[in-house]
């Protein structure tokens, strides 16, 4: 089982060789993931891309080997081994299958808003199941008219009593259709260009998937358009201040 056992930070030192050295634990991890990738992921790469189907078996494989826990601290069931080891893992998987590497990349990106800006309750509620690989997230920012410009987005969130009501759609979202929840950026005050960040579970009424993109490559990682039609979420699903979501988007 992968767990932090040393300082994995790479700091500035007196020599260039030391500055770019990699800890032995990271080398061991690299070799372990390289073996898994070459022996079990690479043989599936062609079929994954040819079928354009999400590789659930690879996600299970990564979870069973603690690889999906790399982005997370130990208190949430992760490895606590830091960004260096995460990026080494992504690199090794991508060498065998780019689609499969995005499983780990999105596990990191989709939970980053919660890890950086979420409440303790939100972290406890959403992070352990992602660290174990039981659930997978998606980060929903880009829109057809706005691209990835948070200030121009048209998806809205309106407060109605104790709930927020989300309306709109997103484009080019990695993990669309397979994610268990979306971190959705939505306008809370269009006139003043205020936005918020909201955790929207995929099984909530009003959540659907519109278009799935037909891509030239990396076809096993779905890219699509989640649609939110009068989707109601509790106040507890707001990440931080509902009018300061721009800092969340830019921080990620």
Positions of predicted regions on the chain:
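Glycine-rich beta->alpha junctions and the first turn(s) of the following alpha-helix
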Residues: 7, 17-22, 29, 95, ...
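Hydrophobic, small-residue-rich alpha-helical packing segments that form membrane-like cores
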Residues: 147-149, 164
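Short, positively charged and aromatic/hydrophobic N-terminal segments
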Residues: 1, 7-8, 12
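Internal helix-loop-helix
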Residues: 64-134, 174-181
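A short core secondary-structure module
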Residues: 163, 167-209
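Long, well-ordered alpha-helical segments
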Residues: 33-40, 118-125, 161-167, 197-207, ...
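A short, Trp-centered hydrophobic/proline-enriched beta-strand micro-motif
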Residues: 133-141
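A structural signal for short hydrophobic beta-strand segments in well-ordered beta-sheet cores
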Residues: 155-158
